[in-house]
């Protein structure tokens, strides 16, 4: 039986994980829960599993992880707030089921160096879960490229991004997700972050990581091998499967999702990204290749831009413009440099510095 801590238990991934565990109670024991919002739901979840180990907020979540004996931690917190939970999980030698890609992107090589055993970080993102499964079909040296699939979001065929409302941006065509990742999917920024995540998790150079649009969201990603073979992982669009795979690793999950209906006629399209989406993807590649604190800076820039859009301060069309502007200003003013400080302190300091810069940029744009 695996002892599980879920941080971000009241969010989209957290609640889906709880539903999965309730169907597989013989395999999992929830020993801790943490959330930043919906405290009444958090209390209800704790009662269901009979645990008194609960926490509110990012700092308390990290303390809970350090103080509680567990086999696996599901980090389902949204955004940079998940950094401390990832740090605490790796520091205490627990296995990390990672839905919070932002923390890995921020921590980068530092977090990879903290891992104490193979498979300590198991991805929850459907794309990276698919890659992890497909890479079992060959040796690392035999991999030619990784191909990340993207639904294209709700605006793939739209020429102009002007006039898009918050409701429009949250209406994802295939996935049920939280607001931040839904908007990041709509701008394709999420796919840019996933390129950085794939590079860190699998050690494949950026030049060998491609993106294709697959509107049906059935093929979740692919690995192309040097002999010309392509190994893909396909399933219905349901996050329960990658959640279950990450929690059950190295075994496959039971009672996850229904199989595809192979007797029914299906259409699988694969299309190139649009010029609009490549702006996000290329910006992420640039930050990832630069390394150091730059991926953390990029993430903070985007989080501030998305929050400004959600607050009605900027238009949807300006999200990536703000992200790019803040990132460019930061890189002009600061360079990656060695520091005697704890890397987590450095990351948090530069994250805060970026957010102050973003605040000024957004205020100036709002005044125009």
UniProtKB/Swiss-Prot annotation:
Catalyzes the NADPH-dependent rearrangement and reduction of 1-deoxy-D-xylulose-5-phosphate (DXP) to 2-C-methyl-D-erythritol 4-phosphate (MEP). This is 1-deoxy-D-xylulose 5-phosphate reductoisomerase. Mn(2+) binds at residues 125, 127, 194. Pathway: Isoprenoid biosynthesis; isopentenyl diphosphate biosynthesis via DXP pathway; isopentenyl diphosphate from 1-deoxy-D-xylulose 5-phosphate: step 1/6. The keyword Oxidoreductase applies. Coiled coil: none annotated. Its cofactor is Mg(2+); Mn(2+). Transmembrane segments: none annotated. Signal peptide: none annotated. Its EC number is 1.1.1.267. NADPH binds at residues 10-13, 38, 100, 102, 178. InterPro entries: DXP_reductoisomerase, DXP_reductoisomerase_C, DXP_reductoisomerase_N, DXPR_C, DXPR_C_sf, NAD(P)-bd_dom_sf. 1-deoxy-D-xylulose 5-phosphate binds at residues 101, 126-127, 151, 172, 185, 190-191, 194. It comes from the Bacteria. Belongs to the DXR family. One of its GO terms (biological process) is isopentenyl diphosphate biosynthetic process, methylerythritol 4-phosphate pathway involved in terpenoid biosynthetic process. The gene is dxr. It catalyses: 2-C-methyl-D-erythritol 4-phosphate + NADP(+) = 1-deoxy-D-xylulose 5-phosphate + NADPH + H(+). One of its GO terms (molecular function) is 1-deoxy-D-xylulose-5-phosphate reductoisomerase activity. Disulfide bonds: none annotated. Keywords: Isoprene biosynthesis, Manganese, Metal-binding, NADP, Oxidoreductase.
């Amino acid at each position: 039986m695996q002892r599980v801590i879920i941080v971000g238990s009241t969010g989209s991934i957290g609640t889906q994980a709880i539903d999965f565990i309730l169907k597989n109670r013989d395999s999992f024991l929830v020993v801790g829960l943490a959330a930043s919002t919906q405290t009444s739901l958090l209390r209800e979840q704790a009662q269901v599993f009979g645990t008194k180990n609960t926490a509110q907020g990012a700092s308390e979540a990290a303390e809970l992880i350090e103080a509680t004996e567990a086999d696996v931690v599901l980090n389902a917190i949204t955004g940079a707030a998940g950094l401390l939970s990832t740090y605490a999980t790796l520091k205490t030698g627990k296995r990390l089921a990672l839905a919070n890609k932002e923390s890995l992107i921020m921590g980068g090589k530092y977090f990879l160096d903290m891992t104490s055993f193979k498979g300590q970080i198991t991805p929850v993102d459907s794309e990276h879960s698919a890659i992890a499964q497909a890479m079992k079909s060959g040796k690392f040296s035999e991999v030619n490229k990784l191909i990340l699939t993207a639904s294209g979001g709700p605006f793939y065929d739209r020429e102009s991004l002007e006039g898009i409302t918050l409701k429009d941006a949250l209406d994802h065509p295939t996935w049920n997700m939280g607001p931040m990742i839904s908007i990041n999917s709509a701008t394709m920024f999420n796919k840019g972050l996933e390129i950085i995540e794939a590079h860190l998790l699998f050690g494949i150079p950026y030049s060998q990581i491609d993106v294709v649009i697959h509107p049906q969201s059935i093929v979740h990603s692919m690995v192309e091998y040097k002999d010309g073979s392509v190994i893909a992982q396909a399933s219905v669009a349901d996050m329960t499967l990658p959640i279950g795979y990450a929690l059950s690793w190295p075994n496959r999950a039971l009672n996850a999702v229904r199989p595809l209906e192979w007797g029914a006629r299906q259409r699988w399209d694969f299309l190139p990204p649009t010029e609009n989406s490549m702006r996000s993807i290329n910006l992420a590649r640039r930050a990832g290749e630069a390394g150091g604190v730059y991926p953390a800076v990029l993430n903070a820039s985007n989080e501030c831009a998305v929050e400004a859009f959600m607050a009605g301060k900027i238009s949807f069309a300006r999200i990536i413009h703000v992200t790019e502007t803040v990132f460019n200003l930061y890189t002009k003013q600061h360079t990656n440099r060695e520091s005697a400080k704890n890397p987590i302190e450095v990351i948090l300091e530069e994250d805060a510095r970026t957010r102050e810069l973003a605040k000024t940029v957004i205020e100036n744009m709002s005044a125009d």
